[in-house]
Amino acid sequence: MSDVSIARTELEPSVGKILPEKHFTVTDALLEDYFEGLALERGPFDRGETPVPSMIATDADNYFSEGAFRQQRGHLWMRQEWRFTEPLQRNETYVTQGRIEDIYRKRDRTVVNTAVTLSDSQGAQILSFNHHQSFLLDAPVEEVQFREPNKKPGMRKFIVPDGEPLAGFDCDITLEMCGQYFHGNKSYHTDLQASKELGFGDVVVGGRMTMAYIGHLLDGHF
C-alpha cells in the first residue's frame, strides 16, 4: 500500500476512532442566530423566564469533517439521540469530545454513528449525544431521489402513544431563515449551488433546524 493510500485510509472513519477535543461557547451571537433563524419569540429567555434552549447544543455537533467519508455526494443526517444532565449556560465555554462508536448499513447507505460528550470547565458532563450520518458509498448518483414516505416498502404505521399531547405550531422555513440559523455559512442547507454539487435538486433544510423545533416544544412543555 502506498503512502497516499495509507493517508487516505487513515482519514476515513473507522470504529473506535477518537476525534479531536474542541470547545463550544454559548455566545450571544449564537443565541441570536438560533432565535432569528427559527423565527422563535425570545422574550421569555431575555426576561430570565426560560433557560438556554436545549437545542442550542446542536452547534456543538461539529465533527463532520473528522467523521465523514471522502465520498460525500448525497450524504444525509439520519437521526440523533440526546441525553441532558443540566441546562447549558449563557456565555459559558464547554469541552466536546467525540468518538466513532459504530459504522453500519441501512438499506443502500453506510451510516457513521458518532458519540459526543460535552463537559463544563470543572469536567462535569452536561450532555451527550449520538449523531447518525448516512453516506452513499456503493453507487453515488447524479441526483439524489427522495421517496414519498407513504410509498416506502415496509412502511411502519405510527401509533400515537398514551400520554399528554404536546401543543404544536406551524412555521414556514425560508431560505433566509436557513442562512441565519447556520450563521451565514455556505452549505447545502443554505445555498442552491452548494446543494446541487452534492446531488440534491434544492436546498436541504438542515436536520438541526427540525430538531430545534422539537426541542422548543419539549422545553416549553417540561
What is the predicted role of each segment?
Residues 1-2, 121:
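Polar low-complexity intrinsically disordered regions
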Residues 2-79, 140-222:
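Hot-dog-fold acyl-thioester-processing enzymes
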Residues 78-122:
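Hydrophobic beta-sheet segments that form the core/acyl-binding groove
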Residues 106, 138-140:
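FAD-binding core of flavoproteins
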Residues 126-129:
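A structural microfeature
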Residues 132-136:
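Short beta-strand edge segments in extracellular beta-sheet folds
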